[in-house]
Curated annotation (Swiss-Prot):
NCBIfam families, per the entry: orni_carb_tr, PRK00779.1
UniProt pathway: Amino-acid biosynthesis; L-arginine biosynthesis; L-arginine from L-ornithine and carbamoyl phosphate: step 1/3
InterPro entries xref list: Asp/Orn_carbamoyltranf_P-bd, Asp/Orn_carbamoylTrfase, Asp/Orn_carbamoylTrfase_sf, Asp_carbamoyltransf_Asp/Orn-bd, Orn/put_carbamltrans, OTCase_ArgI
Official protein name in the record: Ornithine carbamoyltransferase
Gene Ontology BP term (one): citrulline biosynthetic process
Keyword Nucleotidyltransferase: no
Similarity annotation: Belongs to the aspartate/ornithine carbamoyltransferase superfamily. OTCase family.
Record GO terms (molecular function): amino acid binding; ornithine carbamoyltransferase activity
Gene: argF
Subcellular location as annotated: Cytoplasm
Task of the protein: Reversibly catalyzes the transfer of the carbamoyl group from carbamoyl phosphate (CP) to the N(epsilon) atom of ornithine (ORN) to produce L-citrulline.
EC number: 2.1.3.3
Binding-site residues for carbamoyl phosphate, renumbered to this chain: 53-56, 80, 104, 131-134, 259-260, 287
Length: 306
C-alpha cells in the first residue's frame, strides 16, 4: 500500500474528499461542544514555511495540538529546501523524525520532490500552482450553508492563480460548473484549461462570470512574490472588484468567500466581508476543522501500512 500524500485535491478520490468534508463538520461540532478528542498523542507535525502565513500556521498547529500531538515550526530562516542540502536529503532526514509534514512554499515541484523521498505523509499548505487545503475549507463551508455543491455554479473573480487551479480541480471532482472571470493575460494556465474544459468557462468580464452564480470567490490581485507587479495589476484588475453590484447579478442566495487576507477597496469593496451573504469568517475557521479531518485521514491511512 503506497504512502498517501495531499499535494493536490486529486490525491483523494471523490468519495474520500466527501468523507473528509463530512468528517470536518463532525470535528467542528465536537470542538464547539468542548469534547476532547486526542487520537494522536505523541505524534509530531512538522510545518515548513518558505512562504509565511498566519492562518495556515495557526490552523495546523492548533489542529494537531487539539488531537493531542505537537507541532514544530520551521521558518525560511530555519530551512531552505533545495538551497544548500538537496530536497531529497532534507526529506529523508526530516521525515525520519516526524509523523506528518506540511510544506508551504513557492514551486510545486518542491513538495512533489519532498514527498517522493518522505517516509511520512506530506501536505501541500500552498504552492504557486495549488492551494488544496483552502479548497477543503471552502467546500466544507458551502456544504454547511447550502448543502451539496454538485450541479451549482461557482464564479471565480480575479487572477487565474493557485486558488483558481484548485477550484478547477474541485469543479471536476465535485460536479459543479466554474466560471472564471479574469482580465486578458491573467487567465488560468492553458494546460489547466485544456484539462478541465468540460467544467470550466473563462470570461474576460467579472459581470459575465457572476451571472446566476451560487458562490462568488475572489483573492488578492497580487500574491506574495508579485509585489513588483502591484501597480500593473491594480490597473488590469480595476473592473474585477467583488462588490454589491456584482453580487446582485448572482442568485439571491449566492455566497461570498475570500481566502484572506483581503485588501478592502481593491479586490473587494470596503464592506464586502460583512455582506449578508459573506461566509468569510466561517470559511477562515473551517481551515482548522478541514485540516484536522485531513490529518486524521492521512495518519490513519499511514497506520494501515505499518
Amino acid at each position: 500500500m503506497a504512502l498517501r500524500h495531499f499535494l493536490t485535491l486529486r490525491d483523494l478520490s471523490s468519495l474520500e474528499l466527501n468523507s473528509i468534508l463530512d468528517r470536518a463538520s463532525e470535528l467542528k461540532r465536537q470542538q464547539h461542544a468542548n469534547q476532547v478528542y486526542q487520537p494522536f498523542k505523541g505524534k509530531v507535525l512538522g510545518m515548513i514555511f518558505e512562504k509565511s502565513s498566519t492562518r495556515t500556521r495557526i490552523s495546523f498547529e492548533a489542529g494537531i495540538c487539539q488531537f493531542g500531538g505537537s507541532a514544530i515550526f520551521l521558518s525560511p530562516r530555519d530551512t531552505q529546501l533545495g538551497r544548500g542540502e538537496p530536497i531529497e536529503d532534507s526529506a529523508r532526514v526530516i521525515s525520519s523524525m516526524l509523523d506528518i509534514v506540511m510544506i508551504r512554499t513557492f514551486g510545486h515541484n518542491i513538495v512533489e520532490r519532498f514527498a517522493s523521498f518522505s517516509k511520512v505523509p506530506v501536505i501541500n499548505g500552498l504552492t504557486d500552482d495549488h492551494h488544496p487545503c483552502q479548497l477543503l475549507a471552502d467546500l466544507q463551508t458551502y456544504q454547511e450553508h447550502r448543502g451539496s455543491i454538485k450541479g451549482k455554479t461557482v464564479a471565480w473573480i480575479g487572477d487565474g492563480n493557485n486558488m483558481c487551479n484548485s477550484y478547477m480541480e474541485a469543479a471536476h471532482m465535485m460536479g459543479f460548473k466554474l466560471k472564471v472571470g479574469s482580465p486578458k493575460g491573467y487567465e488560468p494556465k492553458p494546460e489547466f484549461l485544456a484539462e478541465f474544459a468540460h467544467c470550466v468557462e473563462v470570461f474576460n468580464s467579472a459581470e459575465d462570470a457572476a451571472v446566476n452564480a451560487d458562490l462568488i470567490v475572489t483573492d488578492v490581485w497580487a500574491s506574495m512574490g508579485q509585489e513588483e507587479e502591484q501597480k500593473l495589476r491594480e490597473k488590469a484588475f480595476l473592473t474585477f472588484q467583488v462588490n454589491e453590484a456584482l453580487m446582485a447579478l448572482a442568485h439571491p442566495e449566492c455566497l461570498f468567500m475570500h481566502c484572506l487576507p483581503a485588501h478592502r477597496g481593491e479586490e473587494i469593496s470596503e464592506n464586502m466581508l460583512d455582506h449578508k451573504n459573506s461566509v468569510v469568517w466561517d470559511e477562515a475557521e473551517n481551515r482548522l476543522h478541514a485540516q484536522k479531518a485531513l490529518m486524521e485521514f492521512l495518519l490513519n491511512e499511514n497506520a494501515k501500512r505499518a
